[in-house]
């Protein structure tokens, strides 16, 4: 691809765009998001999408078509952001933040697929075929993105060196400016990004050199992947498909192999070259592997459908089915280009297939971030339908999945709350209430009387007085699972041979053990230690041992080291 001619005015405009992007993101995140979280969900994605498309595509700010594309991108991003905001309302902050990052990844993929079409519509000279320009644009956009990451990384490394050197002589101004001043961080990121894009777009020959390096690597990998493809497909008749169906990750592995085969072929198959860069036997190997690629997709679809039939739809399975659809279209397109040539160079049809696949993926990504293919809704509806039809039992209802599924999941949890059959199990009820109301709801139910009534006293141990129960509720989080009848067991043992028995609380629902000791001076009980409960120690085993008198203590074989009165704990596995 030839160097892009950018006028001085366009370059200054791009620099201003980068600075404005940093400034707007700073205002949205540092100032406005604290008042209303919607500023981040709506403002940041729309701002970054708008400015990124402008930086990657602009040739002249006077092009009306450019502003039409930018308006379309801005409106579409706002629409998808609105849908994300509606989904994540009421979701816990950590999950909402993860959903926003996932949305950012979707936007990045959409941008990489849409940019070649925008750039092609804005180019001044139409001296190459549509696919040839598309192929070059995808390469350049991906490598420009790589240059952006490298430029920002190197810039911040230099700034880190700068600040650390001045810290050596007691000057902390630069460290504060570079790494603790929000406006400087955002403006620097925007400026460096704009400069990196200008450099990469005006020095296309350097980008072409990097492209050739990666193409050579793909040229060496494709025969190896093709050999793997053929060897595995030859092995299948001897092992049978049943071996695949037993593995959860089978569909993912098969789709990954098919994707590698197709993407490497798309990389190596330069539309400017008339033939493949291999000798006869290797060409035959690669073409044969491409012919069997649809078989991998069909087998992956079969393995995936088995899981859907057995367990219903989930977010991952829906995405897997969409990946099957894309790879099936892609692989069958390559299959037809090899088998049904009619004297035509396969690269012509393969180019059309690649263009169609790029549009298909773009449409799917947009639909996934809209009500049409809402993966959360589909997953929750499938899960609840299986429960209501009796295919899933109450114990098979996944509260965690519902909790992480936004509005739809919360509505499903509310319906389970009124389900007497589901709520009759104390543990399920506790998990459900915790998912709906948070841990604070359970902690508020913890009281001295509730603990005294529900904690099981092991045989041979004495029921504590009110002083002990008062000590327990000082940290309600550690004992909130003990509000269920017999969920926790209390055992008395003298662990330090001082004549005063310590009390050990076994919280089996939380897999933890808490040791309490009595302070004779303050006349109070204190939590001395907390550790994880080994899987080998069950409630039944503990109660049986207490009943049979098999509870005791074992002195440690290794003693602690004392250095001039200072004690060094020696904890060795025995």
UniProtKB/Swiss-Prot annotation:
TM segment ranges: 12-32, 39-59, 66-86, 99-119, 142-162, 178-198, 214-234, 248-268, 286-306, 320-340, 353-373
UniProtKB keywords: Cell membrane, Membrane, Transmembrane, Transmembrane helix
Record InterPro entries: DUF4153
Superkingdom, taxonomy of origin: Bacteria
One GO term describing the cellular component: plasma membrane
Principal place of residence: membrane
Localization annotation: Cell membrane
Keyword Transmembrane: yes
Membrane topology qualifier: Multi-pass membrane protein
Protein name in UniProt: Uncharacterized protein YhgE
Source taxonomy: Bacteria, Pseudomonadati, Pseudomonadota, Gammaproteobacteria, Enterobacterales
Gene field: yhgE
